Amino acid sequence: MNTLRAGKLQFSISDDAKEIAWSADGLPLRESRSADFWRAYMDDNYRREMRVRSCLQTYGHVEVIDADHIVVHYDKLVGDDGREFDTAMHVHITANVSTYPGFEMYAEIDNHDDARLNELQLPMIDLDTACDTAREKDVMYRMNGYGDIQPNPWAAIKNNHTEYISADDKQIWCVMPYPANCSMAWFGMQTGGHFLYLGKQDTRYETQLFTTGVSPRGCDPQLVMTTSQLPYAKGGETLTTMRCFVSLNEGDWRTGSDIYGNYARANWYTPPTIPDWVKDMTGWQRIICRSQYGDVNFTYADLPRAYREGQKAGLNFLMVFGWWRGRFDNGYPVYEPDDELGGADGLRAAIKEIQDMGGRVALYTNGQLIDVATDFYREKGHRLCRIDIDGNEYRDHYRFGNAGTSIRTFGYKSFVTACAGTPEWIDLQLEHEDLKFSFGADSAFYDQIGAFAPMPCFCEDHPHGNRPAQQEEGRRSCLKAIHARCPEGRAIGTEMATDVLLPYVHYIHGAQIGPIFYENAFPAMLLRTFPEMVHTDRFVHDDKPGVERLLNHAFIYGFRFDVSPWRGRTDISSMPLLTGLVKKLVDLREQYREFFYHGTFVCDTDVELPAKVRKGEFLAPDGVRRLITLWNDNPTEVTICVGEESVTIAAGEAACVCLN
């Protein structure tokens, strides 16, 4: 066996490249039976996703470059059914010994077959046991949104069995697309006092899948951690995949955050320069002037009154949707002031009145949807939209209904999604930016372009050419152009967080797990890795039972409040209970404003927490003082020791402890 070592972790492979082994010094970690370290999936347009496993290859051999670098060569690839593909592949594996040692892996693909190589899962960590023989103690830290925690993934992933539509008899998969579900391109597992990390280590930005899997029902235990790259390599094409990194270190998820964050800062991440007024944003009311179904919720003249109602809750920002004539979620991408709502001058006057009260206003446009019932689609949009693997347009169907039941059941609106890097689309977004700022808005907000719908685009006429997964680079190009055009002192916002896009926006309207609360949400994964960004929470729509939990969750992590009464149909004045809850937390945050608004989210102070008590932490601008934020999600009060402080927190309440 040929063995590479990186810290405690070892990877071994036989000369013929059929057998591999994972091990770790002093730990029970070992590979599963007939383990793979990569899998590929071929496609001849008739047979889809023909699996190719590393353990079944017959044309492989290992070349030892030096003690830290091997190349695994395959002259041909062989499918599960014995079909041979005239596809050569060369997998580079390098042991990287640094602060966090690990293995860097990537592949060179040279395809001469009629079948296309759609997907390559590399690296693949295919285990029978990790670092604890009690498998149920393992915890997966997934990049689900801003991050979440999955206890006992060996059992939990079984719940992803599709029962019908997928080949669960071969593997049960839990898939997280990047971007969209994933805000960052890494994840890992806490196991036996160590953190097993897998992440991208490359400057390229492509659609990617981060995946965990377990064995089919009735089979021996197996847990797989991998990432799928999507080369879509056709016959006659040669390409190199992105580099990825595997590492095992003593400690917890913070080692993964360090590995990814350190690489990003050294290679592609520059923190955005955010205006102070954005940092000082307490939250906003998000309202819709003209609804999806044509009703008028607010005229332009109503906007100052709506803002004043938000002020009573401590909110200092108004996010305005549906301000154009065509109706919200209709007519995209055409935006014109609505004369019935007050016309261009009325909109400009309303914004000025809010600003005179000390408020800020953002105007919405959608960054990627094209309404197929428009002249724009018929004349241009059909050329700019993303195309699927069969040559069809991706379609998105909205079912926003009014008081009836038919539209909410059957829908009425269809969209295609723009391939964001097409020059005409970028030019159009710049026109929209100029339009929004022409009314005096403080911010131009672009919905969805931050991550939504990361579908590969198979239109080779677009700038990504014959690399469908590289359509994601178009998002970066588009937002980079928008950001560069933004006047000084104003701001660009978008919906959903993706790490590579953070340098080109000033705030994120949260729409993933993290800003959206659920029991296992753990947004500290993103917030610690890239702490500079301003984020809002999501789904505070009314004073429903449990809304206090959403607000307390947002509070401890520093999310600004996104309050959208009745989903933008009214203002907060109709909800005095919600007004009081928001105001209470805004006032508490104000007592520690230097931490919340101008500090840095960190995770340095370990505190022993009772069950259902959650924690955040902020470092003051002086780099010394710390604020510990706590939320007691129990039905009874709890007492917690934080450093030398003892704090008692009432049931369902949030509290702060300042450490000097």
Q: Model features per residue range: what roles?
A:
Residues 4-5, 167-277, 300-301:
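Beta-strand-rich recognition/accessory modules
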Residues 9, 29-55, 63, 69-79, ...:
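Polysaccharide-binding surfaces and accessory modules of carbohydrate-active proteins
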Residues 315, 440-442, 559:
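A structural motif
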Residues 72-76, 91-95, 107-109, 225, ...:
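Short, hydrophobic/aromatic-enriched beta-strand segments in well-ordered soluble domains
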Residues 15, 237-242, 430-433, 468-644, ...:
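Active-site-proximal substrate-binding groove within the catalytic cores of carbohydrate-active enzymes
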Residues 8, 107, 236, 310, ...:
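Conserved, mostly hydrophobic/aromatic
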Residues 319-544, 549, 573:
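Aromatic- and carboxylate-enriched substrate-binding clefts and catalytic-loop regions
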Residues 248-327:
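An acidic-aromatic substrate-binding cleft motif
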